[in-house]
Regions:
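Negatively charged, low-complexity tracts enriched in Asp/Glu with abundant Ser/Thr
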Residues: 1-39
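A short, structured beta-strand/loop element
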Residues: 34-74
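Mixed-charge, Lys/Arg-enriched low-complexity segments
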Residues: 2-3, 64-113
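Short linear sequence motifs
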Residues: 10, 23, 27, 48-49, ...
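Small/flexible residues
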Residues: 7, 11-13, 28-30, 56-61, ...
């Protein structure tokens, strides 16, 4: 997905997800991008249309045993977490360059959370 297509999807409020190489063989890793206006918990009533888009970017790794065992994965099972809010599209695109080859999709597949 090109940068422009990524931004177009996010501007519609669509979260995007993608798997990335993990740091160890026992782990799997993902990136999730969650667009929002206001705070990560949502806008105040009545001002959603005037607020700029911001982007919560979560990167984490999960032990394969949780995924392959088809267990529910909870926050406490996440390892090597990064959780940041990007205030602009330029910041977001710069952040995404940390993961070359990241293939984002609006279909989470086996995204565990």
């Amino acid at each position: 997905m090109t940068d422009e297509r990524i931004l177009a999807r996010l501007r519609q409020g669509t979260p995007l997800y993608g798997e990335i190489p993990a740091s160890e063989p026992r782990l799997r890793a993902w990136v999730g991008i969650y667009p929002f206006k206001g705070t990560p918990h949502g806008p105040r009533p009545g001002n959603a249309d005037v607020l700029p888009w911001r982007y919560r970017v979560r990167k984490f790794e999960v032990d394969r045993k949780w995924i392959e065992g088809q267990f529910d994965v909870h926050e406490e099972e996440l390892e090597r977490q990064e959780d940041v809010v990007m205030g602009s599209e330029a910041q977001l695109l710069e952040r995404l360059r940390r993961w070359p080859g990241l293939a984002l999709s609006d279909r989470p597949g086996d995204y565990p959370i």
